[in-house]
Design a protein with these regions (language model features):
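Cap/lid segment of the alpha/beta-hydrolase catalytic domain
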Residues: 1-49, 105
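Accessory cap/linker subdomain of secreted extracellular hydrolases
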Residues: 1-2, 7, 75-188
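Catalytic nucleophile serine of serine hydrolases
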Residues: 23, 64-65, 88
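The substrate-binding groove and active-site-proximal loops of carbohydrate-active enzymes
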Residues: 26-35, 58, 112-121
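Tryptophan-centric aromatic hotspots in well-structured domains and transmembrane helices
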Residues: 42-47, 51-53, 71-72, 97-98, ...
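Alpha/beta-hydrolase fold nucleophile elbow
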Residues: 52-65
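Short glycine-enriched nucleophile-adjacent loop
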Residues: 65-78
Length: 188
């Protein structure tokens, strides 16, 4: 996709989320949303607009989490943001993705494991990455059949912050203060 845009005169910029890949962060990982993504998006948009290679017009696009973060950035109203194109981004993670209908959506189990592969807390530990990849992803069906889970007993235990997120998703059946901060609820 970046090539398509570059061939048409656009600059394509990708920003890593906090605590993923080599971005800043304290290792705390929010699978869905967090309180600072809108602020980070605002700062990035305004930084891009100030670059000599930019005409001052910035647009955002993406699906899933990229849809969520562009909505969060747009809510801050950065002056150089001209357009957003969010695709498949839920406005309330609790209601429309993680616990639709009340029970934990099983796809969230593997999604959190997928995101662990780029989490700062294990990125430099090959054994931990392999434990997550082999145990949590390759054997996901077997793990899901072992429910109920307990902290410290799942392959994600090598990434404590993500394990905490997994168990918050797993145990928190009612919408509460944790879900409110995790969702950054945008439901009208």
């Amino acid at each position: 996709m970046p090539d398509w845009y570059a061939q048409r005169g656009y600059v394509f910029v990708i920003q890593d989320l906090r605590s993923r890949y080599k971005s800043e962060g304290d290792g705390r990982y929010y699978h869905t949303c967090n309180p600072w993504e809108g602020d980070d998006g605002y700062d990035t948009i305004e930084w891009i607009a100030a670059q000599s290679w930019c005409n001052g017009k910035v647009g955002l696009m993406g699906s899933s989490h990229r849809a969520i973060v562009q909505t969060q950035a747009a809510l801050r109203r950065p002056p150089h943001l001209m357009a957003i194109c969010p695709e498949q981004g839920p406005t309330n993670i609790y209601l429309h993705e993680a616990r639709e209908g009340g029970a934990m959506a099983l796809h969230m189990y593997t999604a959190i494991y997928n995101h662990a592969l780029d989490a700062q807390e294990i990125r430099d530990d090959l054994d931990a990455v392999l434990q997550v990849a082999r145990g949590g992803l390759a054997d996901a069906r077997q793990w899901l059949q072992r429910m109920p889970f307990k902290p410290g007993e799942v392959p994600l235990s090598v990434a404590p912050h993500l394990e905490e997120t997994l168990f918050n998703y797993y145990y928190r059946g009612e919408y509460d203060e944790w879900w409110a901060q995790e969702c950054n609820d945008q439901t009208p």
